[in-house]
Amino acid sequence: MHEEGGSLGAIDPGDLIMVMSNDRKDVITYVEATNEADENFGYESHGWPGDVIIYRKNGGSDTPVIHRAVLEVVANGSGWDVPGTSLVNVQEITLTLDYDCYNFHDGNYKLNLQSWEPEHAGFLTSGDNNNGGCMIDQPSANSYGEGIGLHDSMGNPVLPVKDDWVVGVASSEIPWVGSIKLLTT
């Protein structure tokens, strides 16, 4: 924690992040790590439940994004499964996560998906973007007007993160070391 308003485990500007290949590690999502019935219950990375992944927006050549994997949608026949939840073979996803939005509505709000119909299988992610991290990066999954989400360099909304768009999983961090690069660019 070296930035005002930062928190333990948070990735701050200037931190050097070690990246583990996603081929070496299965991504554990926030919903899996917070579900008491899931084998990954209690797992944390960078101060919060679930893994932080590095991905390319829509598989493009934009600067990669480093955000937490909130949940994964998996194709199942004609519907969708959400590992770490009771949602199996559903057509749309409605889910309120135990994910406090401290900087949104005075902290009296939970991250919410309302009747979301996935475009394809992949991860939904969230980071320290607008609304204090209480916005899904993928605009189609945001409900109640939390925000516009992320867009790629062509202006297209970011879609659920496919496995082959994932560059890696954030491993350990070394505070301040990356500041040298920030100062020289």
Question: Where on the chain are the PLM-derived regions?
Answer:
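Feature for secretory/organellar precursors and membrane-associated catalytic proteins
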Residues: M1-N103
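Short amphipathic alpha-helical surface micro-motifs
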Residues: E36, G47-G50, N103-N108, A141-S153
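Extended, hydrophilic extramembrane loops/domains of integral membrane proteins
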Residues: N112-T184
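Low-complexity, serine/threonine/proline-enriched polar segments
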Residues: I93-L124
